[in-house]
Amino acid sequence: MKKSVALIIKKEIMPIAMNTITETINTPVTDECEVLVAGGGFAGISAAISASRQGADVTLVEREYILGGLGTAGIVTIYLPLCDGMGKQVSFGIAEELFRLSIKYGAEDKYPTAWLEPGNEELRKKQRFEVQYNPHMFALLAEKLLIENGVKILYGTCVCSVAMDGKKISSVIVENKSGRTAIAVKKSVVDCTGDADIAKLSGAATKEYAPKNILAAWHYSVSVSRGLSLHMVGACDSAVEKEEDVLTNRRFTGLDGTELSEMTQMAHSFILNDIMNNRKRDISHVPVTIPTIPQIRMTRRIDGVYTIDDTQMHKQFSDSVGLFSDWRKRGPVYELPFSTLYGNDVKNLICAGRCISVTDAMWDITRVIPVCAVSGEAAGTAAAMTDDFASLPIEDLQTVLTKNGVILHE
């Protein structure tokens, strides 16, 4: 299909003089799909695979040239637990499939022997079902998996606008090396951007993370004395930070271009300093990989039909679409309500990953890889089934998820 539609788009650019430029742009619609997934992190990978396995024609749009998001390009390479810390696995389906894929050819650290080898049930109470994986191997294997499942991947592509037909997204406007084009959406859109970018562009209600983000500068190095090692410079999150981990008192929203550029430069400075300090002790020490995206954790999320809080562990929800644990402690298990994945404003938009509808206190629990994968599978499956998420019979969705190995309730 190749057709053209004239879209009148106004852009305001505010330099020092506060001038504005009004542009009238004719944007060609060059492609179409049933389900468009925006963002190729763990949530986007899960959503695209699940939608395609349900028979949908799926296009995944990713701004970088590598899949995995923070879990690869961001060097946050710890697949946090699929278990409750008490010896019981709670997250299944694609969450477990991607876990096993990440270490198909070996783990870097924390290999969960008790979970991957038989006869270790007692040891599972002492060892969590988590692992440190190689980011490059995972990115390559994930790409292969998506292609095998018939997903079309557009790398180097940013979503810059949407076209609406009433309360539904009819086309997604993208920019890449081909210029500015539109992709017609025949059914639904899954926002896996991590920042609720599609929700924001489409006019859906969103909320920002009030505490903002701290600076991290994780990177990989190799040396004769230590071999390959992950340097977790700076605190990874506010929940477990120690005073000595805090690199700067400045906090970052993750939603401002200038701020993100400054944050990246600060992170690079700390990485370089860490490298040079290590080289003083071992001249063979050299960097292997540094993050190519900002190591931002929590920014903006949708204001969904329902918002879940961290106090609701072990609570049963009639619209549960999966289970996940609190990676920070042993015991708590949560059901994921389907109503946290979509809002009231845009009928055919659903979210997965760290931009689902949760309180600030809950955000640190739900932003991690297992929850991204669980929510991604639910969102992608639903996206293949409907163009109006509020009207989708939850029993129909739950039947498909259960058939695919997802556990809905404790």
Predicted features along the sequence, with ranges:
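Conserved N-terminal/central alpha/beta ligand/cofactor-binding core
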Residues: 15-17, 24, 56-57, 63-161, ...
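Flavin (FAD/FMN)-binding glycine-rich loop and adjacent Rossmann-like elements that form
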Residues: 26, 70-72, 94, 98, ...
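Active-site-proximal beta-strand/loop segments in catalytic clefts of secreted hydrolases
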Residues: 38-40, 61-64, 192-194, 354-355
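Extracellular/periplasmic catalytic domains that process cell-envelope and extracellular macromolecules
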Residues: 29, 54, 64, 342-344
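Extreme N-terminal leader/targeting segments of oxidoreductases
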Residues: 2-35
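Ligand-binding pocket scaffold of soluble enzyme catalytic domains
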Residues: 29, 33, 43-44, 182
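N-terminal Rossmann-like FAD-binding beta1-loop-alpha1 element of flavoenzymes
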Residues: 35-56
